[in-house]
Amino acid sequence: MQVTECRKAGQIGYAKRRMEDKMDILNKAKSGKKERPIKVVQFGEGNFLRGFVDYMIDIANEQGKFDGDIVLIKPIEFGNLDMFHKQDCQYTVSLRGNVNGEAKIINRIVTSVADAVDTYNEYDKYMGLAEIDTLRFVVSNTTEAGIVYDDTDKFELEPPKTFPGKLTKFLYHRFETFKGDMSKGLVMLPVELIDDNGIMLKKCVMQLIELWGLGD
């Protein structure tokens, strides 16, 4: 039985590799992606944000209601962004359900993501995003453990170790870049599954501002 199961597993694995070899890898040329201004930085690159927020922004772009792109930010040290760069950050969302009593599958190539940046291996590029004039929104889903104040976090770290630390330093750099211009402020859209996520994130940022002496 074990030999048979191993043989079947091997056959499945081989078939999967053959299928992957035959599949066309998406890229910006194949998806027909248009160049749009960067309006969103998104902390977190998981399925929920890509299948929900980024998907809706893609539709808004198509309808001419947003005209903006997203840069994904990897806020944690482990893992990599290879699978995103392999496809130029283009991917497919598949919706399956019933329409008027009939089963229906809708596949959509999402083109709203322009790039993906690693805060640890691409720190300068990450901080450079704060200098983008068209930037307007910050979306985050760093899990329920992401929004936390840590008084051992350091401004001098590149990057700071916590998500609020990374965000605070990012916002401070933007503040300095645009010399305090209030019109260059950013709208925060945290979707972490904790009560009062926006209030808690603001509290962490304000505590870090005080800890690091960034206020007036």
What are these regions (language model features)?
Residues G10-G13:
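Residue-identity detector for glycine
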Residues M19-D216:
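Non-transmembrane, aqueous-exposed alpha-helical and coiled segments at domain scale
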